[in-house]
């Protein structure tokens, strides 16, 4: 069974796929229990001064405060090299393509830039994604005490630090919002399925609960 998760965070000059540029990408791989495998990678990508100067003020201030702009200007790494570095690290821990979901916070935006600029990396990842922000939004609606009690974020706006915070956040939700291992019994699962489908649970339902596809 392939249970690894590939955590990626990107920093860009903005959120417009038509004009903005990818300037930093970091990756960490975890196992199913959210243990980090290896040291991860954090790569700053060079872009020209024209692209940097086109950033809106709030983004330019954020990246200047974090030190990222200076690192972008001094970097000699292009997109192709950055993609290769990230894939080399991931391949050390994920041996089969299209088996590990992409994980992170509001990860759809990051994936859009990855798909545009790093298609080999994008195609290596499973099409499914695990978005921690989705769990956050559900907790806000269903378990507000958990939502308001979540760990404070550092807001560094640097890719690798943001991944560590996302992993910590999911660990928090696992311990507060999810049922503890090993989860409900087979009978309890069958009873919930029966309740949701409006039909009584039968012995066959209970016996076959382990065998149902999880799609």
UniProtKB/Swiss-Prot annotation:
<dbReference type="InterPro" id="IPR012337">
    <property type="entry name" value="RNaseH-like_sf"/>
</dbReference>
<keyword id="KW-0963">Cytoplasm</keyword>
<dbReference type="InterPro" id="IPR013520">
    <property type="entry name" value="Exonuclease_RNaseT/DNA_pol3"/>
</dbReference>
<feature type="domain" description="Exonuclease">
    <location>
        <begin position="5"/>
        <end position="170"/>
    </location>
</feature>
<feature type="active site">
    <location>
        <position position="127"/>
    </location>
</feature>
<protein>
    <recommendedName>
        <fullName>Oligoribonuclease</fullName>
        <ecNumber>3.1.15.-</ecNumber>
    </recommendedName>
</protein>
<dbReference type="Pfam" id="PF00929">
    <property type="entry name" value="RNase_T"/>
</dbReference>
<dbReference type="InterPro" id="IPR036397">
    <property type="entry name" value="RNaseH_sf"/>
</dbReference>
<dbReference type="InterPro" id="IPR022894">
    <property type="entry name" value="Oligoribonuclease"/>
</dbReference>
<keyword id="KW-0378">Hydrolase</keyword>
<keyword id="KW-0540">Nuclease</keyword>
<dbReference type="GO" id="GO:0003676">
    <property type="term" value="F:nucleic acid binding"/>
</dbReference>
<comment type="similarity">
    <text>Belongs to the oligoribonuclease family.</text>
</comment>
<dbReference type="GO" id="GO:0005737">
    <property type="term" value="C:cytoplasm"/>
</dbReference>
<keyword id="KW-0269">Exonuclease</keyword>
<dbReference type="GO" id="GO:0000175">
    <property type="term" value="F:3'-5'-RNA exonuclease activity"/>
</dbReference>
<comment type="function">
    <text>3'-to-5' exoribonuclease specific for small oligoribonucleotides.</text>
</comment>
